[in-house]
Design a protein with these regions (language model features):
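A structural signal for isolated positions on well-ordered beta-strands in alpha/beta enzyme cores
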Residues: 59, 188-190, 253
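Conserved P-loop
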Residues: 35-123
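Short helix-terminating capping/connector loops at secondary-structure junctions
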Residues: 52-55, 148-151, 247
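Generic alpha-helical propensity signal that fires on short helical segments
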Residues: 73-79, 226-231, 270-272
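P-loop/Walker A phosphate-binding loop and immediately adjacent motor/lid segment at beta-alpha junctions
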Residues: 98-101, 222-261
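Conserved P-loop NTPase motor cores
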Residues: 14-16, 26-48, 63-65, 111-237
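Conserved P-loop NTPase motor module
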Residues: 1-28, 119, 125, 130, ...
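Hydrophobic side chains in beta-strands
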Residues: 60, 158, 255-256
């Protein structure tokens, strides 16, 4: 018997991306010490995704946003940018309600599309329920207009918030519960941190699909990351590839666990394959 790979109803196919970027919803950790270009990396990542109009909304939580003029480069994207100078559970709840409202609006549009298609084939209005007829009347019996160019995908980025206890809770938290269901919300997450194990909750680390790692002078920090990825490569190989990838200025070691090509799982800056020495 041939086993089919069924996908959730209503979910679009993977979207186009450039380089070796994940083509679906992801959780990303950008780990970089001070002065190694974290902000620059975030901007490049978001802009590369924007080249294919991947995200419709970007929510940036960053207390240093106004003090860092580089972030102004994000203002000219094809997405709707929302910026927050702090993180609280209440603010995050509002963000998730906004995301859910967009998805509900999109799903209602899809329902109306099917209703309109049924109308084109129908021989009588008796085939429709009262609710359907009410919807058709609101549509003026015309083809519905899409509220967005495509199903709304969102990105939530947390930058410079390692000390925020509501966000970085090691136990149950609002963010952690949402992150586990990020694909249902069509939402990706980016955590930008200077420390790894002591800052990022274990649950987040265990569900990360994409690691972007800058040069590190601490083998201890490198091993802290590598020890959690030994099912993909040995600890020594991960450290060796990390050192090789970041030997040149502004180069990053990228671990993309979502890559459909195993040869591009470990790369320098997404598109230069690395092999364990």
């Amino acid at each position: 018997m041939k086993i089919k790979n069924y996908q959730p109803v209503g979910v679009q196919e993977e979207r186009k991306t450039i380089h070796n970027l994940p083509r679906n919803h992801f959780v990303c950790i950008i780990h970089s010490s001070k002065g190694t270009g974290k902000t620059n990396t975030v901007i490049n990542l978001i802009k590369d995704y924007d080249k294919t109009k991947f995200f419709q909304k970007v929510y940036l939580f960053s207390p240093s946003y106004e003090a860092d003029p580089k972030y102004q480069h994000l203002n000219d994207g094809n997405y709707d940018l929302r910026v927050y100078n702090d993180f609280t559970n209440d603010i995050f709840q509002e963000v998730m309600e906004d995301i859910q409202a967009d998805l509900d609006e999109w799903n209602h549009y899809l329902y109306r599309v099917k209703l309109y298609e049924k109308l084109q084939k129908a021989k009588s209005l008796k085939q429709f329920t009262q609710h359907d007829l009410f919807q058709l009347d609101e549509m003026a019996y015309d083809k519905p207009i899409a509220p967005f160019p495509c199903e709304p995908f969102s990105l939530i980025c947390f930058d410079d918030l390692a000390s925020n206890k509501q966000l970085m809770s090691q136990g149950k938290s609002l963010v952690n519960s949402v992150l586990l269901r990020c694909r249902h919300f069509r939402t990706s997450f980016i955590y930008v941190v200077q420390q790894y194990r002591n800052a990022v909750p274990k649950m987040v680390r265990a569900n990360t699909d994409l690691f972007i790692l800058a040069i590190s002078k601490s083998r201890k920090d490198m091993e802290a990351v590598g020890e959690e990825l030994t099912s993909y490569a040995s600890l020594n190989d991960i450290v060796s590839m990390w050192e090789k990838a970041t030997a040149e200025p502004f180069s990053y070691f990228v671990i993309n666990l979502m890559s459909p090509n195993a040869n591009l799982r470990f790369t320098r800056n997404f598109d230069e394959p690395l092999n364990a020495v």
